[in-house]
Amino acid sequence: MVRKITELEKVLIQKSKPPDRTSHFLNKAVKLGLENKYAESIVCLDRVIRINPKLAIAWYYKGTALNVLGQYQEAIICLENVHRNWCEAWNQKGIAYANLKKYFEAITCFEKAIKFDTDNQSAYAENKARVIKELEENNV
């Protein structure tokens, strides 16, 4: 359920033109994430966030890395700092809630991901379907 960075996101990082230090640590964090070095990536992302706490992509990557590391509550907190119409952030938030067994919150997040991204609705719908199935199996 965790995905790799897309080419579009790479372009968005480059186009956002943050200050040099921010760009350096953000690029390093992305590289470390692609190497599955999530804890090290988070250290870099924390530096980016200290420099520019409004840089949504840093919060998104940190939330995604925390999800991979199983730190779901912390992931949700990070993902709260991402733009409300960023579908992949809603998807990551849904994954975190699902792993915390907060199924109704997860479903809501997946529905928002579907709403904001008409191109990838099937991936988010699959995540939503998994949560609904788990709800049914656990008689919640």
Where does each model-flagged region fall?
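Canonical tetratricopeptide repeat
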Residues: 27, 61, 68, 92, ...
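Start-of-helix register in tetratricopeptide repeats
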Residues: 23, 57, 88, 122-123, ...
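Register position in tetratricopeptide repeats
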Residues: 34, 68, 99, 130-134
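Canonical positions in the second alpha-helix
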Residues: 47-48, 81-82, 113
